Amino acid sequence: MSLNQPQPTVQEIFKNYTPPVPAYSVVTNLLAEVPAIYLTGVDSVILTNIECGNRKKRRQKTLSRKRKVAVKDCRGLYHQQWQGIPARIELFVDNIVNGIPLWILRIPLICNLIFAEVLFHEVGHHIHYAKVPEHREREGVANYWGKKLRK
């Protein structure tokens, strides 16, 4: 990251949950690998669990590949800039690590890959919206950028 473009802040907001991995340091290290131009406009990355949201938020739906998906089942969300509120990325740590054995999560390389898949996919949504708009399906573009950033 260059000095004139600050890196997005990483915030941990959990309710009745302790992540089994050092999610803050993992995400901070992954963000350091993303070229600064792609993160311009992203204010923060919020690490949270699904219980942290209120009932209304947990019941919300989002669109993915022309289908409605419950937010409570998502691993991450990208919130674009809107009415003066800067863009942000929300990662649901409990959903990211759900179903993965603890001994696998303790291997740093694998833990980084698991978080990189979700984080870079959401950064891909930001790139698609703010930097390189394309007339293709949103999830496909986000997957493309996610894979490109993981290399």
Residue spans of the language-model regions?
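A metal-dependent hydrolase signature that marks the N-terminal structural subdomain at the beginning
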Residues: 1-90, 98-108
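Acidic carboxylate-rich catalytic motifs and surrounding loops in phosphoryl-/glycosyl-chemistry enzymes
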Residues: 49, 131-133
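Post-HExxH zinc-binding segment in Zn-dependent metallohydrolases
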Residues: 135-151
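Short pre-active-site segment immediately N-terminal to the catalytic Zn-binding motif
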Residues: 96-118, 133-134
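Pocket-edge structural micro-motifs
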Residues: 93
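Active-site recognition of the HExxH zinc-binding catalytic motif
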Residues: 117-130, 142
